[in-house]
Amino acid sequence: MAKQIQAIRGMNDILPTQSPLWQKLEAVLRDTVAAYGYSEIRTPIVESTDLFKRSIGEVTDIVEKEMYTFADRNGDLLTLRPEGTASTVRAGNEHGLLYNQEQRLWYMGPMFRHERPQKGRYRQFNQFGVEVYGIASADIDAEVLMMSHRLWQKLGISEHVKLELNTLGDAQERAAYRDALVEFLEQHEEKLDEDSQRRMYSNPLRVLDSKNPDVQALLGDAPALMDYLGEESRGHFAHLCELLEAVGIQYEINPRLVRGLDYYNRTVFEWVTDSLGAQGTVLAGGRYDGLVGQLGGKDTPAVGFAMGLERIVLMLETLALTDDVSGPVDVYVTAMGDDCRVAAIKVAQQLREVDGLKVMSHCGGGNFKKQMKRADKSGAKLAIVIGETELANGQVALKYLREEKEQELVAQDSLAAYVAELI
C-alpha cells in the first residue's frame, strides 16, 4: 500500500464537523465590520520579500526566523505573507486608494509563519484584520477598539478578555527614548540574556517585550517612555483613554507593551486572555502613521488591528460557547420506493426555497431503517418521509429526530411554510 501523504506540520485541516463554528465566527466578523461601514480588501498570498523587510523590519523575529521565502523561476525573492497590514498598504499605494482619502478596510485570509507549532499557534493560520487610513485623530483609535470590544460581546467572551494599552510616541520621541534605553542597557549588559544583548542596538524597544523574568526585573529601573513624550503625543493618548472611559471600555496601561512589528507609533494595544492557560494575546494592533510613506506612498495616518482566528475558535471551545452552532443540515428527505424518488426530489427543492433552510436528499435508495440511520447521522432536526401512501394522498410524513414528538402528516403544498415555522 502506498504511504499516505500527511498535512505539513503546523498546517491543519478544518474538517466538516469544525466548519460550522468557523462559519459562525466569520459571520460575526463580517456583520460587525459592516455595521461600522468598512469595506473588504483581498490581496495575494504571495508578495515580494522586500515588502515585509521594509515594513515589519529586518531585525524582527518574523523576518529573521519565521518567513516562508523562496526564489521563483526568474530569481525574484517571494514570501508567503506573514501578516496582512503590509499587503494592504502596498495595494492601497499601488491603486491610489490612500493619498488624501479616508479608507476603512477589512481583510480575512491565511497567513504563514515558520513558528514552533503549539496550542493556538500554527504555521498556517487564518487572520482577520481592519485597517483605517487618512484619519489622524484618536477618535479612530477608539473606534477600532470599540469595534473589537463589540466582537467580544457578540461572541460571548467579553468577560474573558482584557485590554492593555500603551503609547510609543512619534519618531523623534522614540529616538530620544531609544538613546536613553540603550545607555541603561549598556550599564547592565552582563545581566541581559543573549537575545536581549543582540537586540540592544538593533531594536532596543523589543527588549522591553522580553519574556525572560530576570530581564523584566531589571527593566523595573529602566527609563520610562512616557517621560519622553511631547504634548501632542500625550494629548492623543489622553483623548483615547477619555473616549474609552466614556463608552465603558475598561483598559490597563502597560508601559512594556511595544508590539513585535517595527512600524507602530503612538497607540499600541492588545486584548489578552488567560482562558487558554498562560496569558495569551487574542487581538493586537495600533497606529502606524509612517508605514504608507515607508512603502513608497505619501505620508498617511493609519491605525488597525489583527486577530488569529484559530485562537478565537480555541477560546470558544474551551469556554464551551459552541452549543448554538447549527449543523450543516436541518431537514433530511427520504423516499420509500422507486416511485417516490421523483416526488422526494421535488419536495427537497421546494424546501430549499425557504431562506436559510438546509436540506439534504437521501440518494441511492435503501430500506426505511437504513434511510433513517442516515437521517440521524446527518444531524438533521427533521426527516421527511415519502412513501406510496403519502404520495397518493399528496402528503409527507414528518418525523422529529431530536425531540420526543409524534410523527405528523403534512400536505405537500403547505410543507415549506410549516417547516419554516418549526425550524
Swiss-Prot record:
Matching Pfam families: HGTP_anticodon (PF03129), tRNA-synt_His (PF13393)
Subcellular localization, as worded in the UniProt entry: Cytoplasm
Reaction equation(s) it catalyzes: tRNA(His) + L-histidine + ATP = L-histidyl-tRNA(His) + AMP + diphosphate + H(+)
GO cellular component entries: cytoplasm
Entry superkingdom: Bacteria
InterPro entries: aa-tRNA-synth_II, aa-tRNA-synth_II/BPL/LPL, Anticodon-bd, Anticodon-bd_dom_sf, His-tRNA-ligase, HisRS-like_core, HisRS/HisZ, HisRS_anticodon
Any GO molecular function: histidine-tRNA ligase activity
Coiled-coil positions: none
EC number(s) per entry: 6.1.1.21
Membrane-crossing segments per the record: none
One GO biological process term: histidyl-tRNA aminoacylation
Stored SUPFAM superfamilies: Class II aaRS ABD-related (SSF52954), Class II aaRS and biotin synthetases (SSF55681)
Alphabetical UniProt keywords: Aminoacyl-tRNA synthetase, ATP-binding, Cytoplasm, Ligase, Nucleotide-binding, Protein biosynthesis
Family: Belongs to the class-II aminoacyl-tRNA synthetase family.
Subunit details: Homodimer.
Protein name: Histidine--tRNA ligase
Organism, scientific name: Shewanella loihica (strain ATCC BAA-1088 / PV-4)
